[in-house]
Amino acid sequence: MLDLGVYPISLVQMTLGKPTEQVALGRLSDLGVDLGDVVIGKHEGGLSVATCQMDGATSMHAILTFEAGTIELAKNFYGPTKVRLTVFDLDPTTGAAVSMHKQKWDARVPGGFQYEAAEAAHRITAGDLESPVVPWSATREVQEMMDDALAQVGVRYPRF
């Protein structure tokens, strides 16, 4: 969770905020390390499902589902990636999808974290203590979500 899980949990927090309820299931190694986790959140704006796995290959893609469409972020969604927007035209009487429009973008650039580095450099140069793009409060919420999930899964930290 603390390695790969931060990406899907951060995406959940950025799009829906901290859940009002959260349920987590996971699989622990013999040493008590979480190898795979599923975190389901209930939010005022909808539901979220975040997964991560340490001992297997995953696509690390993301799908955001809305009332009239989806946004799909391709492999390794946490960096610049391919994006596909699908918008459904809904029948006003039944609410059923009657047609669909797709738009694709390729936002891939080598590296992937240069935007974060540029924002950090900008804020440090300006003498700012935090970024409004991802304020400390958002970082704390992500950590609280992960801590709650890890506790539910059964991860225990050694006491020294």
Task: Give residue spans per PLM region.
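Surface loops and adjacent helix of pleckstrin homology
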Residues: Q53, A74-N76
